[in-house]
Amino acid sequence: LKDLVFLDIETTGLTPATSSIYLIGAVYHQQMEWHIRQWFSDSLNSEQEILEDFFSFIKNYQVIVSFNGETFDLPFLKKCAAAYGLNTDVLDNIRSFDLYRHLRPVKTLLQLENLKLATLESYLNISRLDQATGKEMIAVYHDYLETGDKRLYQVLLLHNEDDLKALPQIMPLLSYLDIFRSEWTLAGYSLSTASSSLTIVVDCSVKVPVAVTRELPLCRL
């Protein structure tokens, strides 16, 4: 665990060319405890500073765990850093583990509406204090810049904190992937002539967070 760091960023838009990073958050394990560290841009001129501080911190880790980070967070960090002439080798030298990419097969198995972080949290009954979206936080950040209201500052930090805390908590979903690789044992079956259906019951040794029962054509797993 000491080599892992969970990453989530908050931005003012979707493209680095017209947007900026206003918050970088990291969760890491140290001395038998989980810790959260956040770098907040309290003005439009402090983005470079938080990037430099974050890069100094991240060089101590070997794996970055994110949610859709390989598509969004990491490229965004690199492009924003490049705009300031910062060296981004530290990100290239760290392995990336994108939970979103690895959990794609789980969406169909669990019959999820989508693969958003909030959907996965709901499936696992993970509660969070913040209910707003990242898009809604952009307006909150701009309001903070105009007013300096510390309550808005806390709202921004909480949103990022809840996202960060969710990342380690959804990792047990990866165990569903082992279902496809494990050995199955026939536990029983029944044939119904009334409904013209065959039910097959199999045992799987994989431990998963929530039991799964799925109906397939001609059988039930």
Model regions and ranges:
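Short beta-strand scaffold segments in enzyme catalytic cores
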Residues: 24-26
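DEDD superfamily 3′-5′ metal-dependent exonuclease/proofreading module
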Residues: 1-7, 14-19, 29-221
